Curated annotation (Swiss-Prot):
Belongs to the delta endotoxin family. It comes from Bacillus thuringiensis subsp. wuhanensis. This is Pesticidal crystal protein Cry1Gb. Pfam families: Cry1Ac_D5 (PF17997), Cry1Ac_dom-VII (PF21463), Endotoxin_C (PF03944), Endotoxin_C2 (PF18449), Endotoxin_M (PF00555), Endotoxin_N (PF03945). The keyword Signal does not apply. The gene is cry1Gb. Promotes colloidosmotic lysis by binding to the midgut epithelial cells of lepidopteran larvae. Toxic to Pieris rapae. It comes from the Bacteria. Toxic segment of the protein is located in the N-terminus. The keyword Acyltransferase does not apply. GO terms for biological process: sporulation resulting in formation of a cellular spore; symbiont-mediated killing of host cell. One of its GO terms (molecular function) is signaling receptor binding.
Length: 1169
């Protein structure tokens, strides 16, 4: 019998015409709304690759043809289901946004089409980029606004459609972005937004769907209607949202929706007979397919009707039927009817029912009693070819009104198949007044096919609920709403189930398996085919115990080892093991992926695998390549850490172990102590030593480990420095060593390697161009850690190098390397190698890390001869230095000894004054190589004898200060302890020498001094008088006993030591002296190389001027914290007088008559008894 198609929706070809006006009507029926939703779902299922065809499909189906009226009908559909009407203002806002989305999307797809026709045209690229950004901005801000507060449920279907549009748009940008001219960073950001949007949109839709379903707390027809219509309009879309992840699904993907929905109970419109639907909803179960209905006919009050039935079904791949218990009663008013679909493929289902319900409302024995009867007289079951299996009579209640076709042809465009039939009936205690026998039809989506066919050229997703057998301990549970159907669960280790699969490709085709799962524990998944083990791997937990299942709870993770099927019809089994009981493991589905497909994650894995392999000299990972740097290993570690746990957890762990092994090998060959900067100045003779302004920073997006920051300095005499000595015991004779590391940025950073000479390079590295983009904002992880996976790491595992002079190789501008050659080694001499980093400019700075000092290669040929020659020169110069040092040391020691009265060095000679101490100190400082000229805090070959004599000089200063009862007599502390009248100054003359300047005759400087009455004192003053008049230093008591020292410019005076000068030749002498003062007491030397600006020589050429006196041309004179004066300049006079106080207080007064009086020091010394 031919059944006329009663689906009066708009023809499919009209929907494909964006210029069609057919849908431009004021009101949509619920059937039309459902049809459009079903067509969109079909579009996604069948045409799910980015590009114009998919974009135009969305446009033609909905976004290009809907105006305010159509969107209003969409909103009205849900309003009627939940009995809530949106306010006119909110409705107007929502509709205007939807219309705006459509207009913006229209502009975008026009630009997309233009670009597809001319993909190399810069104008087309710019236009599609601009249109994409405009539409993306509109959806990014507009979709959340579709969830109108208080009306989230009423707007849920249009929210889902808007979300679907946004995901499609983002997927286009990720897929085409590189060809559009977007940067990789921009594409990665869009991909992150795509994944986050999938999660957020899914969770919103499922949340409010569940709220709406929960509000219908009584199982009644409205419950099933809500479930059906919101599943079609919202949940079916949501179940397909994950497929928009273009990096996970880069090729066509075949998905299946296994959820089950119900058409309304088969009752006449307006029927009021009471019945219960409480037991109609099926419990979660493995998916089954209807094979036969056995219907029993009863008779009630003269009406023959459907009184009961049995259902025979089968599961996918199952060879036997499942016969369900009897629903209703096995009445015998008529012979039993058997309703069986055709066995012909494609026709073995019912896509439509035409039912004949009957309702009678009859009076009883009195006016109060009425008998209401609701029954079904017959049903026509329609197959896709419109062939009919008839139970008694065909009716007019059409299931297509609720589950319409997806197009015109019932043969190819039906949307659902009849799956099962349950039975609703009146309560026994209500009969016979209310008598109802009502069948309830449940349906599954056409995408869920009776066979699990694995195609060779698509990703085949098979929900595990399509297994034909459950293993003990596995259960089917209701899906969380976003999986497209029910899911399987285990709470203890074991197999889930067996799934029959059909292979259409040659059996040589290889596949890989992925699993969409959620778990509260780390676990192992095992897979087998026909009992043969295929894969086994570890997978991480995805959620915490007690949490509700949400979109983010599920991960798609896979095995990387491909396999083949041995039979065209095979049994696939999956199990979960190695987790403790009472945890929960859920599986949504299994994915079979052609092995030839390359995913972004697999490309990353392959890249990481190559990078790891490139670290080692051989496949057994015994040795590390010499040119693999510490920084390199850290970046490879980042590559491995950024691999997805979902897809390659086992491989990630294996690669991670290999990288850790490489790191240990790197540490073993690194001769530096504490290369990771755990501390500076922690141990006196070990590790790093440095100036106090250096800071250790924790790892960031550039450095995985600690690194150091060196700031600039305001005085080049006091540079910022960091150094370490490589012990002689660690070095091999006649071997080249290399210092290398990574500099994030630097300015005026000087790097030294010192043994026989100084290898030196000044490095300026701008803070851009590193492997991690420094110009971008550093992304932050969820715990505040640097997110090293946020941007794509561009790294060449082949270490493409640009070499200099054929010997030295630097593969990135931020990498530095400096080598030094070692000749013979001597543990007694313990020369070692000094590693120094130094900054001596105000604008200088550096951030560096991953430092290594390692053996590079033995010296041969010319290099060997060169180092032997350099070593001989160094020894010759050292012998010469030793001879010179012996002479200088004897002279300096004689001068130092002369300061003291005995060899215990505990008393000064009576005539020892400050100038004599200064002169002795100068002789001590004539000892060369006390400290390295490159960095004066590092001791040189003569450090021991220098510090011996300098220590005695320090003692002399201390004894001198102790016996001088005048405080601050050298004015080093300014005018502290002095009383001042009038205007005077303390000036630093030529590198920190302080003098008192009395420029005016009315000025006076004085100090009260406590003395011992009856003892003798010597007043000693060193001063210079400039101009006319006299300078006077007076000592007196309160009333009498006054004496004074006078200084005049025009009287010839004896000047210590044995210098004389007159007023006529003073000026010439001053000019000759000007600028010769040196540092007196500033901690350490800054005696730097005079040729520090010369570019680094990367060949192994040695400096010929080793052991030259670096201080001769250097204004920063080393003194290790003690006094360092040159002899007094010509013109200064030292005078003294004896004084015997009679009281315990005296006054020292300094003044002049005219001109300027300059005082270097004032001493009041107690005479020896």
């Amino acid at each position: 019998m031919e059944i006329n198609n009663q689906n009066q929706c708009v023809p499919y070809n009209c929907l494909n015409n964006p210029e069609s006006e057919i849908l431009n009507v004021a009101i949509f029926s619920s059937e039309q709304v459902a049809e459009i939703h079903l067509k969109i779902t079909r579009l996604i299922l069948e045409n799910f690759l980015p590009g114009g065809s998919f974009a135009f499909g969305l446009f033609d189906l909905i976004w290009g043809i809907f105006n305010e009226d159509q969107w209003s009908a969409f909103l009205r559909q849900v309003e009627e289901l939940i009995n809530q009407r949106i306010t006119e203002f909110a409705r107007g806002q929502a509709i205007q946004r939807l219309v705006g989305f459509g207009r913006s999307y229209d502009e975008y797809i026009l630009a997309l089409k233009e670009w597809e026709n001319d993909p190399d045209n810069p104008a087309s690229k710019e236009r599609v980029r601009t249109r994409f950004r405009t539409t993306d901005d509109a959806l990014l801000t507009g979709v959340p606004l579709m969830a109108i507060p208080g009306f989230e449920l009423a707007t849920l279907s249009v929210y889902a459609q808007s979300a679907n549009l946004h995901l499609a748009l983002l997927r286009d940008a990720v897929f085409f972005g590189e060809r559009w001219g977007l940067t990789q960073t921009n594409i990665n950001d869009l991909y992150s937004r795509l994944k986050n949007s999938i999660r957020d949109y899914t969770n919103h839709c499922v949340r409010f769907y569940n709220i709406g379903l929960g509000n219908l707390n009584v199982i009644r027809p409205e419950y099933y209607r809500f479930q059906r219509e919101l599943t079609i309009s919202v949940l079916d879309l949501v179940a397909l949202f994950p497929n928009y992840d273009i990096r996970t699904y880069p090729i066509p993907t075949k998905s299946q929706l296994t959820r089950e929905i119900y058409t309304d109970p088969i009752i006449s419109p307006g029927a009021q007979a009471g019945y219960t639907l409480q037991d109609v909803l099926r419990e979660p179960h493995l998916m089954d397919f209807l094979n036969r209905l056995i219907i029993y006919t009863g008779e009630y009050r003269g009406i023959r009707h459907w009184a009961g039935h049995e259902v025979e079904s089968s599961r996918t791949g199952m060879m036997t039927n499942i016969r369900f218990p009897l629903y209703g009663t096995a009445a015998t008013a008529e012979p039993t009817r058997f309703i069986t679909p055709s066995t012909f493929p494609g026709l073995n289902l019912f896509y439509r029912t035409l039912s004949a319900p009957i309702f009678r409302d009859e009076p009883g024995a009195n006016i109060i009693i009425r008998y209401r009867t609701s029954l079904v007289e017959g049903v026509g079951f329609i197959q896709p070819n419109n062939g009919e299996q008839l139970y008694r009579v065909r009716g007019t209640l059409d299931s297509l009104d609720q589950l319409p076709l997806e197009g015109e042809s019932s043969l190819t465009e039906y949307s659902h198949r009849l799956c099962h039939v349950r039975f609703a009936q009146s309560l026994r205690n209500a009969e016979p007044l209310d008598y109802a026998r009502v069948p309830m039809f449940s349906w599954t989506h056409r995408s869920a096919t009776p066979t699990n066919t694995i195609d060779p050229d698509v990703i085949t997703q098979i929900p595990l609920v399509k297994a034909f057998n459950l293993h003990s301990g596995a259960t089917v549970v209701r899906g969380p709403g976003f999986t497209g159907g029910d899911i399987l669960r285990r709470t203890n280790a074991g197999n889930f189930g067996d799934m029959r699969v059909n292979i259409t490709a040659p059996l040589s085709q290889r596949y890989r398996v992925r699993i969409r799962y959620a778990s509260t524990a780390n676990l192992q998944f095992h897979t087998s085919i026909n009992g043969r083990a295929i894969n086994q791997a570890n997978f991480p937990a995805t959620m915490n115990s007690g949490e509700n299942l949400q979109s983010g709870s599920f991960r798609v993770a896979g095995f990387t080892t491909p396999f083949t099927f041995s039979d065209a019809l095979s049994t696939f089994t999956i199990g979960a093991f190695s987790f403790s009981s009472n945890n929960e493991v859920y599986i949504d589905g299994i994915e079979f992926v052609p092995a030839e497909v390359t995913f972004a994650t697999e490309s990353d894995q392959d890249r990481a695998q190559k990078a790891v392999n490139a670290l080692f000299t051989s496949s057994n990972q015994i040795g590390l390549k010499t040119d693999v740097t510490n920084y390199h290993i850290d970046q490879v570690s980042n590559l491995v850490e950024c691999l997805s746990d979902e897809f390659c957890l086992d491989e990630k762990r294996e690669l991670s172990e290999k990288v850790k092994h490489a790191k240990r090998l790197c540490d073993e060959r690194n001769l530096l102590q504490d290369p990771n900067f755990r501390g500076i100045n922690r141990e006196p003779d070990r590790g790093w030593r440095g100036s106090t302004d250096i800071t250790i920073q924790r790892g960031d997006d550039v450095f995985k480990e600690n690194y150091v920051t060196l700031p600039g300095t305001f005085d080049e005499c006091y540079p910022t420095y960091l150094y370490q000595k490589i012990d002689e015991s660690k070095l091999k004779a006649y071997t080249r060593y290399e210092l290398r590391g990574y500099i994030e940025d630097s300015q005026d950073l000087e790097i030294y390697l010192i043994r026989y000479n100084a290898k030196h390079e000044t490095v300026n590295v701008p803070g851009t161009g590193s492997l991690w983009p420094l110009s971008a904002q550093s992304p932050i992880g969820k715990c505040g850690e640097p997110n090293r996976c946020a941007t794509h790491l561009e790294w060449n595992p082949d270490l493409d190098c640009s070499c200099r002079d054929g010997e030295k190789c630097a593969h990135h501008s931020h990498h530095f390397s400096l080598d030094i050659d070692v000749g013979c080694t001597d543990l007694n001499e313990d020369l070692g190698v000094w590693v120094i980093f130094k900054i001596k400019t105000q604008d200088g700075h550096a951030r560096l890390g991953n430092l290594e000092f390692l053996e590079e290669k033995p010296l041969l040929g010319e290099a060997l001869a060169r180092v032997k020659r350099a070593e001989k020169k160094w020894r010759d110069k050292r012998e010469k230095l030793e001879l010179e040092t012996n002479i200088v040391y004897k002279e300096a020691k004689k001068s130092v000894d002369a300061l003291f009265v005995n060899s215990q060095y505990d008393r000064l000679q009576a005539d020892t004054n400050i100038a004599i101490i200064h002169a002795a100190d100068k002789r001590v400082h004539s000892i060369r190589e006390a400290y390295l000229p490159e960095l004066s805090v590092i001791p040189g070959v003569n450090a021991a004898i220098f510090e011996e004599l300098e220590g005695r000089i320090f003692t002399a200063y201390s004894l001198y200060d102790a016996r001088n009862v005048i405080k601050n007599g050298d004015f080093n502390n300014g005018l502290s302890c002095w009383n001042v009248k009038g205007h005077v100054d303390v000036e630093e003359q030529n590198n920190h020498r302080s003098v008192l300047v009395v420029p005016e005759w009315e000025a006076e400087v004085s100090q009260e001094v406590r003395v011992c009455p009856g003892r003798g004192y010597i007043l000693r003053v060193t001063a210079y008088k400039e101009g006319y008049g006299e300078g006077c230093v007076t000592i007196h008591e309160i009333e009498d006993n006054t004496d004074e020292l006078k200084f005049s410019n025009c009287v010839e005076e004896e000047i210590y030591p044995n210098n004389t000068v007159t007023c006529n030749d003073y000026t010439a002498t001053q000019e000759e002296y000007e600028g010769t003062y040196t540092s007196r007491n500033r901690g350490y030397d800054g005696a730097y190389e005079s040729n520090s600006s010369v570019p680094a020589d990367y060949a192994s050429a040695y400096e010929e001027k080793a052991y030259t006196d670096g201080r001769r041309d250097n204004t920063c004179e080393s003194n290790r914290g003690y006094g360092d004066y040159t002899p007094l300049p010509a013109g200064y006079v030292t005078k003294e007088l004896e004084y015997f106080p009679e009281t315990d207080k005296v006054w020292i007064e300094i003044g002049e008559t005219e001109g300027t009086f300059i005082v270097d020091s004032v001493e009041l010394l107690l005479m020896e008894e």
